C-alpha cells in the first residue's frame, strides 16, 4: 500500500476513534472530535465542567432578564470564563465570537433558541432546570464523554455515591416527611421528589412529602396551601439579599399552626447555591449543610448555623 494511503487510513482511524455520541433531549449528538471550546448555558453545566477540570470558554453568568448571576460557591472558579449573557437571555453574538465546538443548553429554558444555537455549534439539550438528581448524574456522564473526560466523570459519580452513603448514616429512621420550597419576596414554590433538591434530600435519607404533580416537578402554593399540607419538617431555600414572603407570613396565625414551626423544624439554605448550581461541586456543599443544620438528624437547627 502506498505510504500516503497508509497515512490517510491512519488519520481516518484516529478520527473515528475520537468521535463520540451521546443521547440528549433532542435525540443524539455526535462529535467528530472531542470538544475543547465549550459554552455552557446553565450553572450545572459550568459546575460539571469545572469539576472535570475543563472549564468552559463561555457561560451565561450574566444578570440580564432578572437572573441572579453566578452562585456564590462558583464565583471563584469562573474568573476566566467569558460571559455570554444570562440563562434567560443568552447572547448568540458573544457565543459566535468564541467559536465554540460544543454548546450545552437547557432543554426547558432554551427550547425556543435551540435551532439558532445548533447553527452556531453542535448543541446538546440536557434536562437541568427541571431535572432530578438522576438526570443531573446522567448529564455529568454525557458531558464527560463529550469533552474526553468520561473516566473522570465516572469517578465523580462514584465519589458522590460514597458521599451520599456516608450522609445517610446521619438520617434519623422514621423521621417525618418534609416539604422543600424556594421562597422569593413574592412566592413560595414547592420542589417535589422529581426536582433536583427534592430528590437530593431523599437520596440522603429523608422522605419528600410531595410527588411530582402531573408534569410539574415544582409549583407555587399559598400559605393556606402549605397549611393544608402541614409538614412536620419544612426546608426553605432563600436568598440572603432578599426578604422572603415567609417573613410576612410569620406574623400570620396560620404560619404558627404549621407543625414544622411548632416543632422547630424549619431549615433555611441559600437558594443560589442549592437550587441553581445543581452539579458535583454544589452537591458536596449541600451534603455538608444537611448534616451541619441537623436536618438529617431531624433535630432543631443550631443557633450558630448559617448558610
Model-derived features with residue positions:
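Extracytoplasmic ligand-binding site segments that recognize negatively charged/polar headgroups
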Residues: 64-68, 112, 126-143, 175-198, ...
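Ligand-binding cleft/hinge of the Venus flytrap
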Residues: 55-56, 71-77, 145, 190-213
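Short helix-initiation/N-cap motifs at beta->coil->alpha
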Residues: 24-26, 84-93, 213-223
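Basic- and aromatic-lined ligand-binding clefts that recognize polyanionic substrates
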Residues: 37-52, 152-206
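A short, structured surface patch at a secondary-structure boundary
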Residues: 43-94
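Proline-aspartate-enriched helix->loop->beta-strand connector
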Residues: 92-105, 122, 226, 230-235
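Structured C-terminal subdomain patch of bacterial secreted/periplasmic proteins
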Residues: 233-307
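N-terminal signal peptide c-region/cleavage motif recognized by signal peptidases
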Residues: 14-18
Amino acid at each position: 500500500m502506498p505510504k500516503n494511503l497508509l497515512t490517510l487510513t491512519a488519520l481516518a482511524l484516529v478520527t473515528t476513534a475520537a468521535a463520540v455520541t451521546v443521547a440528549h433531549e433532542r435525540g443524539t449528538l455526535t462529535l467528530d472530535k472531542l470538544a475543547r471550546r465549550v459554552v455552557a448555558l446553565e450553572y450545572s453545566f459550568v459546575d460539571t465542567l469545572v469539576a472535570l477540570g475543563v472549564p468552559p470558554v463561555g457561560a451565561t453568568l450574566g444578570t440580564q432578564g432578572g437572573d441572579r448571576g453566578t452562585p456564590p460557591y462558583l464565583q471563584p472558579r469562573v474568573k476566566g470564563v467569558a460571559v455570554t449573557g444570562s440563562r434567560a437571555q443568552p447572547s448568540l453574538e458573544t457565543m459566535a465570537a468564541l467559536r465554540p465546538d460544543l454548546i450545552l443548553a437547557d432543554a426547558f429554558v432554551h427550547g425556543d433558541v435551540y435551532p439558532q444555537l445548533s447553527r452556531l455549534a453542535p448543541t446538546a439539550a440536557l434536562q437541568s432546570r427541571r431535572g432530578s438528581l438522576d438526570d443531573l448524574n446522567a448529564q455529568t456522564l454525557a458531558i464527560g464523554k463529550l469533552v474526553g473526560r468520561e473516566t473522570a466523570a465516572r469517578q465523580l459519580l462514584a465519589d458522590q455515591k460514597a458521599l451520599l452513603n456516608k450522609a445517610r448514616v446521619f438520617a434519623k429512621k422514621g423521621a417525618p416527611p418534609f416539604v422543600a420550597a424556594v421562597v422569593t419576596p413574592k412566592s413560595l414554590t414547592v420542589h417535589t421528589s422529581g426536582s433536583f433538591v427534592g430528590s437530593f434530600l431523599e437520596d440522603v435519607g429523608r422522605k419528600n412529602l410531595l410527588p411530582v404533580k402531573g408534569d410539574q416537578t415544582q409549583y407555587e402554593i399559598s400559605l393556606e396551601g402549605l397549611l393544608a399540607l402541614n409538614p412536620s419538617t419544612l426546608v426553605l431555600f432563600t436568598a440572603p439579599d432578599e426578604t422572603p414572603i415567609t417573613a410576612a407570613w410569620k406574623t400570620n396565625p396560620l404560619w404558627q399552626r404549621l407543625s414544622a414551626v411548632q416543632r422547630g423544624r424549619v431549615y433555611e439554605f441559600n437558594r443560589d447555591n442549592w437550587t441553581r448550581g445543581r452539579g458535583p461541586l454544589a452537591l458536596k456543599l449541600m451534603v455538608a449543610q444537611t448534616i451541619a443544620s441537623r436536618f438529617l438528624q431531624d433535630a432543631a437547627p443550631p443557633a450558630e448555623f448559617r448558610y
